[in-house]
Amino acid sequence: MADNTPTTANDFLNGAAQVAKSPEEIAKENDLLPKLITHLDRHLIFPLLQFVADQDEEPSPEITKAKFELLKKTNMTDYVASLYCEIEGVEEPPKEYATKRQEILQRLEIFGQESEKITDLLGREDVVTGLRSDKVANLEFLKKEHDVTIDMVNVLYDFGNFQYSCGNYGAAAELLYQFRVLSTDDDKVTAATWGKLACEILTGNWESAMEEVQKVKELIETKLFNKPVAQLNHRTWLIHWALFPFFNHEPARDVICDLFFSPAFINTIQTACPWILRYLTAAVITNRNRTRNTGQYQKQLKDIIRIVKQENYEYSDPVTDFIKALYLDFDFEEAQKKLSEAEEVLRSDFFLVAASENFVEAARHLISESYCKIHQRIDIKDLSARLGLNQDEGEKWIVNLIRDTRVDAKIDYKEGTVVMNHPPSSVYQQVIERTKGGFFRTQVLSAAVAK
């Protein structure tokens, strides 16, 4: 038999206390690190682990162990040895680390000797000017004029990989570039292109990284044309790698937004990695403050609303839920709640932490614009609360909003309201107003029945 005991105020308060989550709980629940690392090279994972470590006041043994496991198979022996000492609480690492260090130094010297001739040639202007876009012709030219062999070219690839494993990303990028100029081995050229992209990311050369993103995209489209599963997997990896320039290089924002919204890539996101919607949504929202092309911005906003709606059953977090609350449910209180949660999520996300303030600013604009569209007279105190601001801050915010957007409105400081001079009601507004009216009548009837 159902329990018909009336719900008391204390029950509501206790329920609210159980539902309320701390910022740390919100961040932990929405941590994407486990999903991201499965699509990143181990060297690209390291900055994400370091970010987590930097957020902790005290060094975390778990993060230190994770770093050790991540890098122990690389040639970064000195750093791995220091991690070992930290984990085990000793001052000196085992002798095997010193032995491995010596082996690595010897191998570097051998690689240097084996590649010296070809790297010197590629550094000479007279040789470089003789090269053409035809790799076969280039090899013939170098073989005929300078006795260069295929083995010499392949040494560049092996040396580049070795330098990468040592953490010498600048040197690795140059070697892989030189290899790519000469090699006709498709598989190795593809691997070298991915490797150079990783190097440019890890050295923060964002313009070069964007060039490599485009090269990898072209390789996926051409070399894997008849392999749809391989294309899907490679696009998934590229999407994750592209997050680095996406939020670190301002000119990359529009380019990567366009890339992610392209049919092949948005299909990949929806099929293989829907959590990327967090980053695409954040990028679209923050674009409000930086784009001059309002038409493009409105299109991207409509697209992200549609995609969030489609994928809500598959993936959601406070960032995508903000879009859902504001544009699909028209629930301003829920939108404000999700904005507060989204701010915590962004602050704990390696890729989005630098965009958190711009995101909140742009999101408040979107709430204000939507709220103003469906109300004739707006209480400043009420709107301020919906924006998470006090009344003074809210008043300044609304003044700036009216000035920046040139909306036709007047502030009545005496009444503490904003009067909107709307054009004749749109269908959108009529539906909202009728819904509000129906909700009000339902409340009145419920109150009457309760009496």
Swiss-Prot record:
Pfam families in alphabetical order: eIF3_N, EIF3E_C, PCI
Every PCI domain range: 245-425
Gene Ontology MF terms: translation initiation factor activity
Location (main, coarse): cytoplasm
SMART domains xrefs: eIF3_N, PINT
Cellular localisation: Cytoplasm
Keyword ATP-binding: no
Keyword set includes Flavoprotein: no
InterPro entries (alphabetical): eIF3e, eIF3e_N, PCI_dom, WH_DNA-bd_sf
Annotated Gene Ontology cellular component terms: eukaryotic 43S preinitiation complex; eukaryotic 48S preinitiation complex; eukaryotic translation initiation factor 3 complex; eukaryotic translation initiation factor 3 complex, eIF3e; nucleus
Keywords, comma-separated and alphabetical: Cytoplasm, Initiation factor, Protein biosynthesis
Coiled coil start-end: none
PANTHER family to which the protein is assigned, alphabetical: EUKARYOTIC TRANSLATION INITIATION FACTOR 3 SUBUNIT E
UniProt family annotation: Belongs to the eIF-3 subunit E family.
Physiological role: Component of the eukaryotic translation initiation factor 3 (eIF-3) complex, which is involved in protein synthesis of a specialized repertoire of mRNAs and, together with other initiation factors, stimulates binding of mRNA and methionyl-tRNAi to the 40S ribosome. The eIF-3 complex specifically targets and initiates translation of a subset of mRNAs involved in cell proliferation.
The name this protein goes by in its record: Eukaryotic translation initiation factor 3 subunit E
UniProt lineage: Eukaryota, Fungi, Dikarya, Ascomycota, Pezizomycotina
